[in-house]
């Protein structure tokens, strides 16, 4: 009974049986030094993971002052079991500027918190969500959504999301959002399509969005896919277009990957080369470390795991800022300690 009480991954029926046995033999268990407090038992149901990252970023833009950043970031991921189907998940972040030895916000910040339920092939997430567009490998959006998301399907998988995005794009404005994506895998080929609708007053005041500056919507269509030549080499591509914008309305990415570093596999490594074009009126918040919205050009990178749970990354971008047609480049380096 004591060993069973220490386990935190039992079903509801098994847990009820253990609780009845613990109540019946409480005196014997206490005499053996087994602690039967419900508070202590429930505390074991909260699991913590996280990482500590050091990032170096050197950003260059033609006719602008160079920018060099050194950032130390701690992130914690608590996961609490609610019952057999539901969990509560969250992420906490604290940043420190290595040049000034000061935190950017001065405190630990809650990035998101949500409840996630799983019922076979159905997954439901409610709350504030770390949200990405998946079909395009997060070329259009990698940020947060306050609302709900549902995933379901087997051969063809679907994702539907509805909610509100704060700090939409690179501005401190909000947007209402609805989106759907469909994807499937056929042997070595994976592909999908998506539609994403954004509504915000931000678009009316956005310079270079439309000719008349009257539209407050973005309707983004996308397609993406990947092909695995073997266990080491894969080619990925994606394309997206905003049907409402008149300018800078297209985004595309082609990437060739070789292997990849795994934090659990010491000595593993990987590399990639890519060309990306990220029009600012469609790639609102892209996921990349060395390319941002309104940039285009080549990117290369490599990852390596020198020790278990310690990974390193180096990336370089050379290209242009699209709107002003000026040269741009960025160097990015990272060391991550996962726990």
Language model: regions and residue ranges:
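N-terminal periplasmic/intermembrane-space "pro-region" immediately following the signal or transit peptide
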Residues: 1-51
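Outer-membrane beta-barrel pore domains
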Residues: 8-9, 16, 20, 36, ...
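Outer membrane beta-barrel
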Residues: 43-60, 64-197, 226-229, 251-285
């Amino acid at each position: 009974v004591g060993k069973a009480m220490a386990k935190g991954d039992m079903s509801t029926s098994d847990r009820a049986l253990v609780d009845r046995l613990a109540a019946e033999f409480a005196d014997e268990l206490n005499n053996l030094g087994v602690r039967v407090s419900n508070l202590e038992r429930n505390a074991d149901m909260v699991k913590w993971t996280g990482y500590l990252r050091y990032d170096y970023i050197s950003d260059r833009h033609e006719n602008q002052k160079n920018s060099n950043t050194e950032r130390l970031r701690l992130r914690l991921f608590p996961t609490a079991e609610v019952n057999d189907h539901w969990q509560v998940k969250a992420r906490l972040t604290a940043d420190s500027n290595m040049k000034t030895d000061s935190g950017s916000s001065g405190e630990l910040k809650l990035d998101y918190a949500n409840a996630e339920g799983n019922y076979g092939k159905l997954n439901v997430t409610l709350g504030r969500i770390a949200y990405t567009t998946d079909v395009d490998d997060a070329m259009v959006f990698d940020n947060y959504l306050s609302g709900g998301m549902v995933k379901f399907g087997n051969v063809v998988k679907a994702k539907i999301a509805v909610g509100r995005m704060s700090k939409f794009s690179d501005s401190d404005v909000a947007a209402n959002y609805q989106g759907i994506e469909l994807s499937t895998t056929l042997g070595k080929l994976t592909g999908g399509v998506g539609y994403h609708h954004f509504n915000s007053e931000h678009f009316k005041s956005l310079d270079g969005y439309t000719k008349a500056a009257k539209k407050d919507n973005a309707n983004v269509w996308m397609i993406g896919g990947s092909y695995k030549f073997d266990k080491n080499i894969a080619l990925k591509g994606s394309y997206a277009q905003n049907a409402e914008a008149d300018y800078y309305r297209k985004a595309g990415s082609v990437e060739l990957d070789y292997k990849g570093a795994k934090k659990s596999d010491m000595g593993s490594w990987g590399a990639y080369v890519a060309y990306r074009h990220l029009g600012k009126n469609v790639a609102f918040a892209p996921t990349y470390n060395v390319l941002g919205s309104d940039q285009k050009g080549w990117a290369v990178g490599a990852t390596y795991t020198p020790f278990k749970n310690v990974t390193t990354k180096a990336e370089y971008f050379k290209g242009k800022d699209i709107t002003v047609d000026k040269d741009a480049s960025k160097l990015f380096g990272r060391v991550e300690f996962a726990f």
